[in-house]
Amino acid sequence: MSSLDRKKPQNRSKNNYYNICLKEKGSEELTCEEHARIIFDGLYEFVGLLDAHGNVLEVNQVALEGAGITLEEIRGKPFWKARWWQISKKTEATQKRLVETASSGEFVRCDVEILGKSGGREVIAVDFSLLPICNEEGSIVYLLAEGRNITDKKKAEAMLALKNQELEQSVERIRKLDNAKSDFFAKVSHELRTPLSLILGPLEAVMAAEAGRESPYWKQFEVIQRNAMTLLKQVNTLLDLAKMDARQMGLSYRRANLSQLTRTISSNFEGIAQQKSITFDTKLPVQMVAEVDCEKYERIILNLLSNAFKFTPDGGLIRCCLSLSRPNYALVTVSDSGPGIPPALRKEIFERFHQLSQEGQQATRGTGLGLSIVKEFVELHRGTISVSDAPGGGALFQVKLPLNAPEGAYVASNTAPRRDNPQVVDTDEYLLLAPNAENEAEVLPFQSDQPRVLIVEDNPDMRGFIKDCLSSDYQVYVAPDGAKALELMSNMPPDLLITDLMMPVMSGDMLVHQVRKKNELSHIPIMVLSAKSDAELRVKLLSESVQDFLLKPFSAHELRARVSNLVSMKVAGDALRKELSDQGDDIAILTHRLIKSRHRLQQSNIALSASEARWKAVYENSAAGIVLTDPENRILNANPAFQRITGYGEKDLEGLSMEQLTPSDESPQIKQRLANLLQGGGAEYSVERSYLCKNGSTIWANASVSLMPQRVGESPVILQIIDDITEKKQAQENLNQLQQQLVYVSRSATMGEFAAYIAHEINQPLSAIMTNANAGTRWLGNEPSNIPEAKEALARIIRDSDRAAEIIRMVRSFLKRQETVLKPIDLKALVTDTSLILKAPSQNNSVNLDVVADDELPEIWGDGVQIQQLIINLAMNAIEAISQADCETRQLTLSFSGNDTGDALVISVKDTGPGISERQMAQLFNAFYTTKKEGLGMGLAICLTITEVHNGKIWVECPPAGGACFLVSIPARQGSGT
């Protein structure tokens, strides 16, 4: 008997193999053979020994059991004839060739399929190799066969390839949808320019006709004109962005004097500088000739100066300089003495829709597109733009532009025709920020018998509108910002405060906070009027500090009704406080006493009665980690499961605190929860949180924390039970990401189908605007002018403009890509928006649409866009089913109501279509199941996903009269903390 000695070859080539020499056996031959056989048969993978001709000598037990054979059956027989290779004749022939190759001295390795599981009845994939073994003379005497089961690996690779393919297809579809969306908005923006021109043109004609007549509606004409110009500016900006996205924005190069262009734009701001007492310094050379797109260069300078004047306080300094940089480059610098831009935000400010918001100086108007467009125009010129700190404080913007156009570009000469005037600045937009007679706080002589209302609004047009609505019933005085309002309130407290949120100097939410801090003002009711539809902020303000929150736009009738309610409550409260003060008490004191009394009644001690033996068994054998800590969160005891989860031993945990195992960003919340628990302010709680392990890794767990029963004289002991959910959380995050992508793709596809309907819905109000504008022109042109009819026409123009703006807002909101955030849903707005979206497709398919909603609906938390997508998916399925069938009655009914117990919202989508068979109902919500000729079959699966995200249920019923009825139940919000 000989032993094997495996050596590595000195030089390896295609035909090299490991050199294994045979040596004489030692004196302990029997023992060594026994050990070798134990090891050989104990190997988990396939191992076999063949002679030089490929006949079987030895095979380990695992390989034999996998094929369902014995060694005696195959010993001495060709290896390729064994059970493993009997999948097919081709497999047998392939194995024979591999043996012949190895017998010639070449190492063989490949992936093959064999009958190697369940007694040779199941095919598995193995990483197979044949290693030639030679004696000392170099002759091949054995072949060592090895195989490693890689079936799971192959399946995983195939699944990964499939998922990658699906992801690539989804990404490509999203890209196409994004391009379609950009094209759609470009078309909508372009179509809006015509009706806006038809608003402004007739309006200018009316104003020209009424210029010398002292029309009582002149102020309203100016408001309409000013805001229509603002809307036109935003439409033009969106059109520019769409062109840049489509790479259709080009440059019209012209040889021009940059000094003259810069000087012309700068001169438009001199009036604003005088009104705000700002030192406006321009340093320009006499002449600097460059090849640029003049219009885009003027837009660059205009936007930079506009930002500087927005953020520079009264009495500040603004500089605009033009100079040569390195050879063949012009350098434009615009600096101000405003609050500056933090380094962390200097990249973000050039992103689209980003607006800088800093304490004490907030951008109250605009879309956040100005600097984004500046950057785009600069890069089109192959230039650069940067921002840094200005000397002495403030922001310093630097723009570098090449003086020469790219080689081969067409450059117009100075004599080529150009528009008559350079860029004209609409300074009215920036004059609103300057202090003048209208913007200063206005206080009228008060009459003692009328309640006082203070209006805080930075926009003069809106301020004047609110004042006109209320001045007939109340004593109204105004302030342009929160700081001035706080000063006025200290001297003359109002009965009602009406404030905007986004204002310069002091914002509305900061004003509310300051008012509530002052005892003498804390009882004043506050109404917030804002165009910022932030549901989270709205709920926070309503729950903590304000009595009403009204979104812009709003009707004058609704404003008067809400103001009347708040003022009446304030007057009644004042009378009650006065009555109670005569008795030596106050409402606030009584309320405080009631709350404290109720809190004491709710406190109780929870007794735990578990035996020591039972506790010990649970403690030591539980799969969940159990930790006992003192009030300082120091670890007293930790069970084996916790030690295994975190990697700390029993000695490692001695003297450690749970805070040392807590990531720093979670530590404040954990401390607060623990303090509430110890102080009796919170009951037993469960929280999902992370822990730091000994090896530096982080795990996620569900932690349940409670107080142990406490004996008299003993310190409190805290029980913490930790359930490791790291793998579950990672899987859930991956699933959530895929679901978010799928929901967004579905929403984009839905909006793509609605493009024609939305365009139709926008055209209707725009056509009405044009008709009413022409009618108003005729009525005002009559002698005498028909003022009442003109007024009604203007009111209809405003109404239809609001309707077009609402449609655009609704589309932007529906397409906005964002993470799922659960927050209070405005059901009234959801019902209105959904009805508006479905109106056109239902009419186009001759389907009668009815939307029914209860007056009082349960309050639910969720993602409003996803809920709207769910309803639209169900409704469009119903419309399509009715359209494809020959239905005598074509009816679709959407209903919104509470359930019998009032703890859930029930949404019903009922149609009179052909209905659903029992066979179809069993698979209805399965992914990729569809009864249509086209489509992926994902619509109802996405509806199910959205419902489950909101902890709701979805099901379908078949009414006796025919058709189908889909029902969705979403639980109402329970408490204020969920």
From Swiss-Prot:
E.C. number: 2.7.13.3
Pfam families: HATPase_c (PF02518), HisKA (PF00512), PAS_4 (PF08448), PAS_9 (PF13426), Response_reg (PF00072)
Primary localization class, coarse: cytoplasm
Modification type Phosphohistidine: residues: H190, H760
Modified residues (4-aspartylphosphate): D500
Impact reported for H190A: Strong decrease in TodT phosphorylation
Catalytic reaction(s) noted: ATP + protein L-histidine = ADP + protein N-phospho-L-histidine
Domain (Histidine kinase) ranges: 187-405, 757-974
SUPFAM superfamilies found in the cross-reference section: ATPase domain of HSP90 chaperone/DNA topoisomerase II/histidine kinase (SSF55874), CheY-like (SSF52172), Homodimeric domain of signal transducing histidine kinase (SSF47384), PYP-like sensor domain (PAS domain) (SSF55785)
One GO CC annotation: cytoplasm
Keyword check for ATP-binding: yes
Domain PAC: 108-162, 685-737
Domain Response regulatory intervals: 452-567
Sorted UniProt keywords: ATP-binding, Cytoplasm, Kinase, Nucleotide-binding, Phosphoprotein, Repeat, Transferase, Two-component regulatory system
Domain spans labelled PAS: 32-103, 611-681
Statement: the UniProt record of this protein carries the keyword Transcription: no
UniProt cross-references to PANTHER family, sorted A to Z: HYBRID SIGNAL TRANSDUCTION HISTIDINE KINASE C (PTHR43547:SF2), TWO-COMPONENT HISTIDINE KINASE (PTHR43547)
Notes concerning its domains: Toluene binds to the N-terminal PAS sensor domain but not to the C-terminal PAS domain. The two PAS sensor domains may sense two different signals.
Protein name: Sensor histidine kinase TodS
Annotated source species: Pseudomonas putida (strain DOT-T1E)
